[in-house]
Amino acid sequence: MKAGIHPDYRTVLFHDTAADVFFLIGSTADSDRTHVHSDGNTYPYIPLDVSSASHPIYTGQQRKTQVEGRIAGFNKRFASFGSGAKKAEE
């Protein structure tokens, strides 16, 4: 390997802002920001919008939302079916 062409591999603190969860991960990502972690050490800090702590695929929320949406759509579509609501209004 050539010297001086590879990025520095170091421990970086990633923060999932949606779930307020911190991850210490080895990375080559650059950051000008630093943050003091709960272990008392200062690490380069990179905020994240989504991680495994907040993404619906990993939390299981996506399925629940889809099911609720389908049920609500079904109930809305067939709310008056069989109840005679349209005949009573006419």
From Swiss-Prot:
<dbReference type="InterPro" id="IPR027493">
    <property type="entry name" value="Ribosomal_bL31_B"/>
</dbReference>
<dbReference type="GO" id="GO:0005840">
    <property type="term" value="C:ribosome"/>
</dbReference>
<keyword id="KW-0687">Ribonucleoprotein</keyword>
<dbReference type="GO" id="GO:1990904">
    <property type="term" value="C:ribonucleoprotein complex"/>
</dbReference>
<keyword id="KW-0689">Ribosomal protein</keyword>
<protein>
    <recommendedName>
        <fullName>Large ribosomal subunit protein bL31B</fullName>
    </recommendedName>
</protein>
<dbReference type="GO" id="GO:0003735">
    <property type="term" value="F:structural constituent of ribosome"/>
</dbReference>
<dbReference type="InterPro" id="IPR042105">
    <property type="entry name" value="Ribosomal_bL31_sf"/>
</dbReference>
<dbReference type="InterPro" id="IPR034704">
    <property type="entry name" value="Ribosomal_bL28/bL31-like_sf"/>
</dbReference>
<dbReference type="GO" id="GO:0006412">
    <property type="term" value="P:translation"/>
</dbReference>
<comment type="similarity">
    <text>Belongs to the bacterial ribosomal protein bL31 family. Type B subfamily.</text>
</comment>
<comment type="subunit">
    <text>Part of the 50S ribosomal subunit.</text>
</comment>
<dbReference type="Pfam" id="PF01197">
    <property type="entry name" value="Ribosomal_L31"/>
</dbReference>
<dbReference type="InterPro" id="IPR002150">
    <property type="entry name" value="Ribosomal_bL31"/>
</dbReference>
